[in-house]
């Protein structure tokens, strides 16, 4: 059974918030049928978080690039959708073709954050799959996981059949090809699990051998599926294109798990970076590109690269941003380059304020450098700077009065810069496979005391203070360094109703506190205590490729003011990661960039393209703001030079005549876009239809020169709007009662001059004029049908939008466009 066989799903979607989370159909998504291996990939959080995850996009492209593999997506449902699905007995399904999860061969989770565990359980449970690996049978999918959040597999071992350790690019293709061979010869689920267990980079509960992280040694020098599509249909938390320019980090911060997980540092070749950016801009329609790495400013030729990119993409309104820059790699040149199109955030991850404490972390972020950078940034137009700090780091003297030192640092920065400051303070959580894996963690009470002091001390200043929940950090510590007992607590908490633990509006911290209190072991002591360097650790059977002596040596440098030099091709750390197959890889600093292609001159003339488009299928679940974002990216993909507004953040001059309510089909929505130069209407229609997601189709276009629409003083589309014509197909119980109630509503609200109706069998034609708030299709039907969900009893199509270019004149927009 496919999910389309469930007749009530459309009605359910119209009763939940952001239904497009659950419909798929995005531009760049795959729809493959008849493959021997059906699988799903999931980042276990809400759609807008999951679709921001770079690893998910990379894996999606890798898996779908393997012959014989169909990989679809599934995300955690919000509570409103979960409730409706459970009430209706509908299983959770994949987005691309609606496969119920239980019908899949494999479900793969990429885990970037430990507190998504209850989301994993909810996805599994809503798919009709047993929660624990030992309870699954031959008819159940294999449930696997990977990512930085499960490098200590023990707390999740009861849930996953297998856990992949390391980088996927080189390992998964041959692995899944072997799975397909097993399936084709009639092998069982247990045969596939045995295959997984035989791999050196896959952990299972029954495996005795040490597991070694898979490392893609060819990163940066070989083309591989990148973080491209699908393009989110609703606004994601990170709604930009991403190019990974460097993997790993040279800096060796002792608290940083990602720096170990992605070690060694490997820089991507310039031609590959340019190729990926071209694809993101011209094929996918992104105007904001993040140059991703753990420390982008350390990329060998960053100033030259950003200068080149700004020159190449200036005419397309494309801007570039970095997720992270070391204080030492900030420069006036980089700041000015970031200022070219739009300003990205000015962010400083200071972590701890005192130089001696920074030395304990193997990090430098001096106040003098920060103040100098902010002063220069203010001259270039920046108005806000963001700072990240951690409390509870294992620094010299035990971090005594660290909260006071943080306050003093911030006030001194503000006094010297007078810039708006946003401060985020988190509680340090020791991570496995790092030099600080042995450290103690603050209790929840200790964290609250320090955070309260910081917040109270900065009150009254133009300084915004936010913080990560101390209890969530406490809980994170349980799954970061816990053992197999943590899995029992996770499963119990899920069964008691916990979901989406990182979301303030959904988390049930009281339930978690009850679960921890009822445990038959001292959870608090286990989370917060310091570990001995010779003590067995739950993750000892997993190797990141670094020697245990390296971790211990780095830990023993605390309080000695000793820095470990950055990773480089000739470094002498002896950490153990570099060898015959893998090593630090820096590109040649004297590399010659390709000649800039001849810049296609942007025509000075401007044209306005009016276009009519249909909205059907999956697209009826898109809200108006999401539709605007989709159209913007789609037009960007066509290659037309879009006219942008002026100012701080340029926007396309895109306009819509009238928003359409969720769930209503349309045959003739109206919009316009200004472009440089001109085009043939047929060319615009053809190019747009190659660039739109499922359910949207441009049907007609009309091109008008700027001189014409200025001379004729053409009004905006919205100001011309004069109503809409609809068809309503009634599917409820008694059409006569419906018609009687409809006529009564029109009469009682004196809408005869605004609402015209004509019945034909079970269908009604509506002509609704603008000018009366009660003459609104959805509002009227809610009253007439006595329900908040009128589309359960009818299907509505908007056929035409009407306009009034002159008093007493009313015609379709199409007819009006023909007169311009």
Predicted stretch roles:
Residues 2-28, 39-41, 460-600:
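Radical SAM enzyme core and accessory elements
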């Amino acid at each position: 059974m496919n999910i389309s066989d469930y007749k009530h799903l459309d009605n359910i979607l119209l009763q939940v918030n952001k239904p497009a989370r659950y419909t798929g159909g995005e531009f760049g998504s795959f729809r493959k049928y008849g493959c021997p291996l059906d699988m799903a990939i999931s980042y276990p959080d809400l759609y807008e978080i999951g679709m921001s995850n770079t690893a998910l996009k990379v894996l999606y492209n890798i898996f779908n690039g393997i012959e014989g593999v169909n990989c679809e997506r599934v995300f955690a449902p919000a509570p409103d959708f979960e409730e409706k699905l459970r009430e209706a007995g509908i299983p959770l399904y994949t987005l691309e073709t609606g496969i119920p999860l239980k019908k899949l061969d494999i479900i793969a989770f990429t885990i970037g954050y430990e507190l998504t565990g209850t989301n994993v359980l909810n996805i599994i449970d809503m798919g009709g799959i047993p929660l624990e690996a030992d309870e699954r049978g031959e008819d159940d999918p294999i449930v696997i996981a990977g990512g930085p959040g499960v490098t200590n597999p023990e707390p999740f071992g009861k849930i996953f059949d297998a856990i992949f350790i390391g980088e996927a690019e080189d390992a998964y293709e041959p692995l899944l090809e072997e799975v397909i061979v097993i399936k084709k010869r009639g092998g069982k689920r247990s045969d596939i699990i045995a295959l997984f267990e035989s791999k050196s980079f896959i952990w299972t509960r029954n495996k005795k051998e040490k597991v070694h992280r898979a490392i893609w040694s060819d990163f940066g020098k070989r083309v591989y599926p990148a973080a491209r599509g699908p393009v989110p249909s609703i606004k994601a938390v990170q709604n930009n294109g991403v190019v990974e320019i460097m993997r790993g980090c040279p800096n060796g911060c002792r608290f940083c798990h990602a720096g170990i997980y992605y070690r060694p540092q490997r820089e991507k070749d310039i031609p590959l970076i340019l190729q990926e950016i071209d694809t993101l801009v011209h094929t996918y329609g992104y105007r904001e590109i993040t140059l991703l790495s753990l420390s982008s400013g350390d990329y060998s030729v960053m100033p030259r690269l950003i200068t080149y990119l700004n020159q190449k993409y200036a005419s397309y309104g494309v801007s570039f941003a970095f997720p992270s820059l070391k204080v030492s790699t900030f420069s006036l040149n980089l700041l000015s380059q970031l200022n070219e199109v739009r300003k990205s955030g000015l962010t400083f991850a200071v972590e701890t304020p005192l130089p001696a404490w920074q030395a304990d972390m193997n990090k430098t972020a001096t106040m003098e450098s920060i103040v100098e950078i902010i002063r220069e940034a203010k001259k270039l137009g920046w108005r806000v700077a963001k700072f990240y700090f951690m409390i509870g780091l294992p620094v010299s003297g035990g971090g005594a009065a660290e909260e006071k030192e943080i306050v003093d640092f911030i006030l001194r920065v503000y006094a010297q810069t007078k810039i708006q400051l946003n401060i985020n303070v988190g509680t340090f959580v020791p991570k496995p496979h790092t030099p600080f894996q042995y450290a103690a963690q603050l209790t929840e009470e200790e964290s609250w005391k320090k955070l309260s002091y910081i917040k109270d001390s900065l009150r009254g200043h133009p300084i915004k203070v936010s913080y990560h929940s101390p209890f969530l950090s406490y809980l994170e510590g349980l799954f970061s360094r816990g053992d197999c007992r943590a899995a029992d607590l996770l499963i119990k908490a899920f069964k008691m109703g916990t979901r989406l633990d990182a979301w303030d509006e959904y988390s049930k911290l009281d339930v978690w506190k009850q679960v921890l209190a009822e445990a038959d072991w001292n959870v608090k002591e286990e989370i917060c205590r310091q570990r001995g360097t010779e003590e067995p650790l739950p993750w000892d059977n997993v190797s990141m490729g670094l020697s245990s002596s390296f971790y211990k040596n780095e830990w023993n440098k605390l309080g000695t003011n000793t820095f470990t030099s950055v990773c480089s091709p000739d470094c002498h750390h002896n950490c153990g990661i570099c060898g015959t197959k893998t090593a630090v890889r820096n590109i040649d600093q004297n590399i010659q960039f390709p000649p800039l292609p001849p810049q296609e001159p942007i025509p000075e003339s401007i044209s306005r393209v009016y276009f009519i488009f249909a909205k059907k299928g999956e697209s009826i679940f898109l809200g108006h703001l999401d539709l605007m974002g989709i159209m913007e990216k789609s037009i960007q993909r066509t290659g037309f030079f879009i006219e942008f507004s002026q100012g701080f953040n340029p926007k396309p001059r895109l306009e819509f005549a009238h928003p359409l309510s969720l769930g209503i089909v349309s045959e003739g929505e109206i919009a316009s876009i200004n472009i440089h130069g001109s085009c043939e209407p047929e060319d615009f229609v053809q190019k747009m239809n190659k660039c739109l997601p499922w359910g949207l189709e441009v049907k007609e276009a009309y091109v008008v020169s700027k001189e014409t629409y200025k001379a004729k003083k053409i009004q905006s589309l919205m100001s011309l709007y004069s109503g809409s014509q609809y068809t309503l197909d009634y599917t409820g119980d008694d059409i006569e009662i419906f018609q009687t109630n409809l006529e009564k509503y029109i009469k009682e609200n004196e809408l005869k001059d605004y609402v015209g109706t004509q019945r034909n069998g079970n269908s009604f034609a509506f002509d609704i004029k603008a000018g009366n708030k009660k003459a609104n299709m959805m509002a009227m039907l809610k009253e007439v049908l006595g329900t908040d969900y009128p589309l359960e009893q009818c299907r509505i199509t908007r056929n035409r939008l009407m306009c009034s270019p002159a008093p007493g004149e009313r015609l379709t927009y199409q007819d009006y466009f023909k007169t311009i």
